[in-house]
Curated annotation (Swiss-Prot):
Residues 200-216 are annotated as: Interaction with MAP kinases. Keywords: Cytoplasm, Hydrolase, Nucleus, Protein phosphatase. One of its GO terms (molecular function) is MAP kinase tyrosine/serine/threonine phosphatase activity. Its main location: cytoplasm. Signal peptide: none annotated. PANTHER family: DUAL SPECIFICITY PROTEIN PHOSPHATASE, DUAL SPECIFICITY PROTEIN PHOSPHATASE 10. Belongs to the protein-tyrosine phosphatase family. Non-receptor class dual specificity subfamily. Pfam families: DSPc, Rhodanese. SMART domains: DSPc, RHOD. It is found in: Cytoplasm; Nucleus. This is Dual specificity protein phosphatase 10. Residues 169-286 form the Rhodanese domain. It comes from Mus musculus (Mouse). Residues 322-465 form the Tyrosine-protein phosphatase domain.
């Protein structure tokens, strides 16, 4: 009786979903020579198979019981890995030996002659191509990045200048900055949105597939917010990348491009990054508040460097960020700051806005603070703008009572920062970009998600059109800085 097909099965665990044709995979059937029709041998075929797979986290699980084997990678998610199964059809053993046929579990088959098979010790040679023939080995860079196109600095500058002259900035391309936050804060292309995927938390969430760039704006609310601009070009840049195909998977640029491609977008990469763009188009770049102030007083680069810390971290230290005074009466912080009773009393804080759905109202039972909860999540589905006016009124109440107000979320990075930016836009003539810069200058770790940035853009448009009135008197204390 011939062995069951289930007795010769290879199960491969992949770290993320891929298509079988994306795999550099062939079965080593050199051992089949002893069982070829011309040899006259009827020795049974060994129930083993060798797989060459250029992917991490490979698990080889031959079935020995004749029934399908399950694979458990140890995590709690059913979608964290994709299982691909490759069988040899023992019922058609003679044909398989002659043609070297391998049938995949998804019902497709490809032929690979025995003399073209590769084994685990070979890194070069012929492999199965997506079309079923023999092609070239797959490179280390994912195929979806090989099709990424580039845009030259001069071409981007022309697009930006054209939109500026036509007074239609919303018609311009979406520009995404993938560099570390501190570098973005020093200098970036005008209008560029920073994607904070350089820190460990964001990088891990992106790599695990918990969030992606477009996941943040893929919901109905996010799409409505970015409908004007995300239907246009998306341009991504880092410091100095020239060829996106050479970017390694660990680089933020790679992560962002991969996410955009998965969502069906066709992003362009700025050739040479910011370094190349600034050489001829420095007038289209924005700098941090400190650098601008130094140039205004004629201090030059040496004065700017003297004002910056001697040891500047490459990424913001979110976990160790301290309570930040944005205005004399308005403080932006995180969960730990909301628990620090001594500091809150020392700063004369009497009002607290909790912009979360799950964190408790710390010290509520003591009756020392007036609390307001804005139940919001830091996600692509959250409409945060619906709470703007409610938050503004509560902040004004604290201001009129001569008390300080702490607004916080989990980390003081996205939700609470968005409301503070909106408050400054409401009570000054600041643009969204100026208010964003002002808050970032005080608290460098802030990074509202793209969904919230879209809501801020819409809020700015309503302020400019008079749909939402500004409140310019009395003038806010602490806003003497020219932004």
């Amino acid at each position: 009786m011939p062995p069951s097909p289930l007795d010769d099965r290879v199960v491969v665990a992949l770290s993320r979903p891929v298509r079988p044709q994306d795999l550099n995979l062939c079965l080593d059937s050199s051992y089949l020579g002893s069982a070829s029709p011309g040899s006259g041998s009827h020795a049974p075929v060994l129930a083993t198979a060798v797989v060459t797979l250029k992917a991490a986290n490979l698990t080889y699980m031959p079935s020995s019981s004749g029934s399908a084997r399950s694979l458990n990678c140890g995590c709690s998610s059913t979608s964290c890995c994709t299982v691909a199964t490759y069988d040899k059809d023992h019922q058609a053993q003679t044909q398989a030996i002659a043609a070297g046929t391998a049938t995949t579990a998804i019902g497709t088959s490809t032929t690979c002659p025995a003399n073209q098979m590769v084994n685990n010790n070979e890194n070069t040679g012929s492999v199965l191509s997506p079309s079923g023939g023999v092609g070239s080995p797959v490179s280390g860079t994912p195929k979806q990045l090989a099709s990424i196109k580039i845009i030259y600095p001069n071409d981007l500058a022309k697009k930006m200048t054209k939109c500026s002259k036509s007074h239609l900035p919303s018609q311009g391309p979406v520009i995404i900055d993938c560099r570390p936050f501190m570098e973005y804060n020093k200098s970036h292309i005008q209008g560029a949105v920073h994607i904070n995927c350089a820190d460990k938390i964001s990088r891990r969430r992106l790599q695990q597939g918990k969030i992606t760039v477009l996941d943040l704006i893929s919901c109905r609310e996010g799409k409505d917010s970015f409908k004007r601009i995300f239907s246009k070009e998306i341009i991504v840049y880092d410091e100095n990348t020239n060829e996106p195909s050479r970017v390694t998977p660990s680089q933020p640029l790679h992560i962002v491009l991969e996410s955009l491609k998965r969502e069906g977008k066709e992003p362009l990469v700025l050739k040479g990054g910011l370094s190349s763009f600034k050489q001829n188009h420095g007038n289209l770049c924005d700098n941090s508040l400190q650098l601008q102030e130094c140039r205004e007083v004629g201090g030059g680069a040496s004065a700017a460097s003297s004002m910056l810390p001697q040891s500047v971290p490459t990424t913001p230290d979110i976990e160790n960020a301290e309570l930040t005074p944005i205005l004399p009466f308005l403080f932006l912080g995180n969960e730990q700051d909301a628990q620090d009773l001594d500091t809150m009393q020392r700063l004369n804080i009497g009002y607290v806005i909790n912009v979360t759905t799950h964190l408790p109202l710390y010290h509520y039972e003591k009756g020392l603070f007036n609390y307001k909860r804005l139940p919001a999540t830091d996600s692509n589905k959250q409409n945060l703008r619906q709470y703007f006016e409610e938050a503004f009124e509560f902040i004004e109440e604290a201001h009129q009572c001569g008390k300080g107000l702490l607004i916080h979320c989990q980390a003081g990075v996205s939700r609470s920062a968005t409301i503070v930016i909106a408050y400054l836009m409401k009570h000054t003539r600041m643009t969204m970009t100026d208010a964003y810069k002002f808050v970032k200058g005080k608290r460098p770790i802030i990074s509202p998600n793209l969904n919230f940035m879209g809501q801020l853009l819409e809020f700015e448009e309503d302020l400019n059109n008079g749909v939402t009135p500004r409140i310019l008197t009395p003038k806010l204390m602490g806003m003497e800085t020219v932004v």
